[in-house]
Design a protein with these regions (language model features):
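PRPP-associated nucleotide enzymes
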Residues: 1-183
Length: 183
């Protein structure tokens, strides 16, 4: 990993969602979440590290009482291809029993990660599981679930920015970009 590799990735990408569109989407999602579970005192779980940026943008707009925690699991490990192995690094530390749980993630790609989270949260006794993602990728194959709240639908390309990375780089971008070449 080095600066030149990061710049090479950026040079072989294009912006597909502007920063203004991202911000407007965050406000829209917050309004929908508030209308649905604003009175439920939900437990909000952020999936680290991809959801860090999305979570930081969304939480200030959720102007109702909630509890916050994070979980950490991965399928990608700084590559552009998902692995079938789910690796849990941090499970929920707050009790989910009899709670409405809202899980925040950067992107719902094939849906395997969110489905694994859903299954574990429900097995732990949650009353209701919900998910919010900044992006859902359009795929030809069926997914095990779709998010309850979604900012954007993106094409079946490798996307990054707003918390999503390309080989570990560019999570910090305020826009969403897509690779234009297979690198």
């Amino acid at each position: 990993m080095n600066r030149e590799e990061a710049l090479h990735i950026f040079e072989h990408s294009e912006e597909i969602v502007s920063a203004d569109a991202v911000n407007a989407s965050i406000v829209r999602m917050a309004d929908a979440i508030r209308a649905d579970i604003g009175d439920a005192f939900p437990l909000v779980l952020s999936v680290m590290g991809g959801a860090a940026v999305f979570t930081g943008m969304l939480l200030p707009h959720l102007d109702f009482p909630l509890e916050f925690d994070y979980i950490h699991l991965t399928r990608y490990r700084n590559t552009t291809q998902g692995s079938p192995d789910m690796h849990w690094r941090v499970a929920p530390r707050e009790s989910v029993k009899d709670r409405v749980v809202l899980v925040l993630d950067d992107i719902l790609d094939e849906g395997e990660t969110m489905a694994a989270i859903r299954d574990r949260i429900l097995d732990m006794g949650a009353k209701r599981f919900m998910s919010a993602v900044l992006c859902e990728k359009t795929l030809a194959k069926a997914k095990p679930l779709h998010p309850d709240f979604c900012g954007f639908t993106v094409p079946d390309r490798y996307v990054f920015g707003c918390g999503m990375d390309a080989k570990g780089y560019w999570r910090n971008l305020p826009t969403i970009r897509a690779l234009t070449a297979n690198i």
